[in-house]
Amino acid sequence: MRSGLRIAVGIATAGRPLILAETLVELASQTRLPEAFFVCPAAATDFDASQASQLPFPVHVVKGSRGLPAQRNAIIDAALDFDILMFFDDDFVPAPSYLAEVENCFAAHASVVVATGRLLADGIIGPGIDFAAARATLASYELPKTESPLVNRYNAYGCNMAVRVAPVRANGLRFDENLPLYGWAEDVDFCRQLAIYGRIVENARMTGVHLGVKGGRTSGIRFGYSQIANPYYLWRKGTTRPGGALRQVVRNVGSNVLKSIWPEPWIDRRGRAFGNALGFADLLRGRLHPKRILELK
């Protein structure tokens, strides 16, 4: 039985129209379909509008400035009349029961304001995962029968993040557009804004696979700079713990420096290490800021 909650799905996308098209085929296979789908493409060519008529739910194309936070904000502005806004990355493959589990979670737990799912595989930490492998992984997984599938988390993982819209609407909450382009840690900042209004949880029954597609992402130098600038900015802003920010910086810089000797083919480690160095240099000069990546290549 439906709870009466109205769910919208939102995807901000850039440079991956074929991936998005296949992701939408998976979304159309949900056992519980969304009331609406909002897509914010960075460019007109990033979404094939002809696909909209083939999908079993209303499709709305919204316009926003290029960059994940800005595009997601455009989606929020368009979806404020819904109860739950489900953010997916354009390369996230949800299990067929995903949205049904989202509805169950938010209907049963009024204190939950953000829920993220359990990743069965994440291509970000490797060369990437294709759709066939993602489907096979999902098909072979048995959902846990535990009565308490929720675990409290500091933040959700932005590739699959369900948000209760009421506190967002009531308090004018938005993603921070000072974190440009790919965003990087924008999910942490947004979740910590919401944390004062309720629980942030991981739900073991909301499952999916993040393909980790490499195309359409930020350059290594820019990404490396963001690995320094964004944690520092969020620490100064007060939406991340200083210890957590420091551990994140140390871990990322260490990985980039050590692995730049024999880098993985799918990661520009040397570019990232150079971006890290630029970030530290700007910190010493007193001009470290996330938006500086717009001046880098």
Positions of the model-derived regions?
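Short, well-formed alpha-helical segments that are part of the catalytic scaffolds
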Residues: 11, 15-29
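Active-site nucleotide-sugar/metal-binding loop of Leloir-type enzymes
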Residues: 69-84
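Short, flexible, basic/aromatic active-site loop/helix in glycosyltransferases
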Residues: 117, 134-154
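A short, conserved alpha-helix in the catalytic core of glycosyltransferases
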Residues: 156-163, 167-172, 177-206
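Active-site donor/metal-binding and catalytic loop motifs
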Residues: 182, 199-221, 230-234
